[in-house]
Amino acid sequence: MFTRRFIPVVQSTKQNIGKYVRKDARFTLLTYNMLSPSYMWPQVYTYVAEPYKNWSYRHRLLEKELLNTFKADIMCLQEMTARDYEDYWHDSIGVDVNYGSKFISKTPPKYWKKPVKDMDGVSIFYNLAKFDFISSSGIYLNQLLNVFNQRELKYLYNKKVTLTDGASNVIGEDSLLDVLKGKNQVCLFVSLRHKETGTIFVVLNTHLYWKYDEVKLTQCMIIMRELSKIIKQLLPGDVKGQERVKILFTGDLNSTRDSLVVNFLQGQIVSHGDLNLINPMRPYLDRCVYDDIPKDYFVHTCYSGKLKGIFDYVWYHDSDFLLTKILTGNEVSDELLASNQLGLPNENHPSDHIPLLTEFKIL
């Protein structure tokens, strides 16, 4: 096994040079897609040896990672099932080690035949020694299409999406609006106060749909517009206070660095005729961790057979947070190459994603 390195980040951002940072303003943050046992599709993970598909085996590795190796002050987890949260993680990370937590489950899709508790969702765990809990909310993205005005809804209705099956074969066409209504993705918002500095931030965790760029882009727009509302509600009537609210947006965005979603988050205007859409949260989110590290630190964060790429993100603003350390990921690619393995999970890695672990300082 090639050991990943949790190494310092050399900063070149001019506005942060010489800025005073308190030692106690440091915290660690992790985002990680755990790979739900319900999604260990036999037709996808043909390259995984049978013992390493076993949920009990994978769960033991996840326990070691999250409770010991990579335990962060804030942990944002995707594809955690409701059953697993209630039966294990709520107490193991929460009660036993003094972490608070919140969870939201997706609604079961039409094809779902398993118990509702086996449906996955997203969770956020936070170290109560460092943070006070303020509030939380969870949203179902297909129920918030009212964030769009009539012109935008008309575009969503008229825009056609070419539908494909799991093997990328074309199976039909539908309006973008109807496709969005049929998807069950969620987003979790948790507002925390950092004990030592009094800083308030909102932590977001989501897992966007795995295909159709326009669907992922629209889901991201919904999240950003809802976040804008949450910030206004967090400190009502206190404009100066709102300026102190900092944002950490994490999750599996199923989107590469050159995707529509990432371009939108970076502030690129999305234009459709005379319809121009822009990220309302750009003043709060101006970069992701990959903007502050050498390109060779990561090859992929997802190693799901033929589906590989950098899909997992932490977004923030460089006037709010300074990225000080990151757990490199290129060693995983080297490990797979050396062992002639197609992807993850394997004996050492319980998920087809690798955890993205960071350390930040509050500015």
From Swiss-Prot:
InterPro entries: CCR4/nocturin_mRNA_transcr (IPR050410), Endo/exonu/phosph_ase_sf (IPR036691), Endo/exonuclease/phosphatase (IPR005135)
UniProt key word Cell membrane: no
Pfam families: Exo_endo_phos
GO cellular component: mitochondrion
Keyword entries, A-Z: Exonuclease, Hydrolase, Mitochondrion, Nuclease, Transit peptide
UniProt-annotated location(s): Mitochondrion
Note: Present with 3480 molecules/cell in log phase SD medium.
Protein name: RNA exonuclease NGL1
Gene source species: Saccharomyces cerevisiae (strain ATCC 204508 / S288c) (Baker's yeast)
Protein's gene: NGL1
